[in-house]
A protein has these predicted regions:
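ABC ATPase NBD coupling module
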Residues: 64-81
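Conserved ABC ATPase signature
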Residues: 124-128, 132-134
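Catalytic Walker B motif of ABC-type/P-loop ATPase nucleotide-binding domains
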Residues: 149-153
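A short, proline-enriched helix->beta-strand linker immediately N-terminal to the Walker B motif
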Residues: 143-147
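Hydrophobic anchor residue at the start of the ABC signature
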Residues: 138
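Conserved ABC ATPase "signature" region
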Residues: 63-66, 105-120, 172
Length: 284
């Protein structure tokens, strides 16, 4: 089990930012850390990886990553990392990149087969697409058979179609090797598909945690559904107002009375829900 209870304070001339978290992740769980930019997600991951220090305690199974007296170096934590930047060796082919991590040709071939990369194993990195490079990065991260895998928004630079395929590959890896996985993401659909545990960070603090259903499905009472959206534009039309909404990659609109419209402005994050036969907007 992964246990974290720590805080880190950042100071500059303008303001102070404190990251303070306490949570646990069971062995084999896929946990997503979700939140807006600047909420502390990547800093949390860097502390967990050993790239930054914090005050408190972090343990994984029987190993102390850090506490008041101990600090285990990143190399000794036996973690796997995958970042948005592939960080692959461009002068090596795919197979060589994996074997650089660990000289285990049998396991390298197993991973290449699992990630549908066998036909590219002699290809150089510059010959690969973005999605293929990220699969190589994932395979290389697994080569040393880590018990804990850290993913820092690894798919954010890829288009949606490629991203969806990579989600399937990642789930297959997770299911096959049962690696405890921590994913940093700000993509609701990605988190919902991949994770069985979600932690939401806001301004350096955990504001909610639970299963994806508990965190993201916010229907209550007689509500039929509730969808997170953002108001792109609020415009007056005759005696009503029209709210133009961004819902994922789709655009929709909802009619509001003048009384309802006064509670909203452009760029507000809202929940679009249905109650009885009416559509409702609620500010988050």
């Amino acid at each position: 089990m992964l246990k974290l209870d720590f805080e880190k304070i950042f100071k500059n001339k303008e303001k102070e930012f404190k990251l303070k978290v306490k949570f646990e992740v069971k062995d084999g769980d896929f946990c997503a850390i979700f939140g807006k930019s600047g909420s502390g997600k990547t800093t949390l991951l860097r502390i967990l990886a050993g790239f930054e220090k914090a005050r408190g305690i972090c343990t994984f199974n029987n190993t102390i990553f850090f506490d008041d007296k101990n600090f285990l170096s990143p190399q000794k934590r036996k973690l796997g990392f995958v970042f948005q930047d592939y960080a692959l060796f461009e002068n090596m082919n795919v197979e060589q990149n994996l074997l650089f991590a660990k000289k285990d040709l049998k396991f390298a071939n197993e991973l290449l087969e699992l990630l549908d990369l066998s036909k590219h194993k002699k290809s150089h990195i510059l010959e690969l697409s973005g999605g293929q490079k990220q699969r190589v990065a994932l395979a290389r991260a697994i080569m040393q058979k880590p018990k804990l895998l850290l993913l820092d928004e690894p798919f954010s630079a890829l288009d949606n179609e490629i991203k969806l395929h990579l989600h399937d590959y990642l789930l297959n890896i997770h299911k096959t090797y049962k690696i405890t996985t921590i994913l940093i993401s700000h993509d609701v659909s990605e988190v919902y598909k991949l994770a069985n545990k979600v932690i939401i960070l806001e301004n350096g603090a955990i504001i909610k945690e639970g299963s994806p259903n508990e965190v993201f499905l916010k229907t209550q009472g007689s509500q039929k559904f509730a969808i997170k959206a953002r108001i792109l534009k609020l415009q007056k039309q005759d005696s009503i107002f029209i709210a133009i909404l961004a819902i994922g990659n789709q655009i929709s609109q909802v009619a509001l009375s003048p009384l309802e419209a006064k509670d909203f402005k452009e760029n507000d994050e809202v929940l679009l829900s249905q109650k009885a036969f009416a559509l409702n907007l609620t500010k988050i």
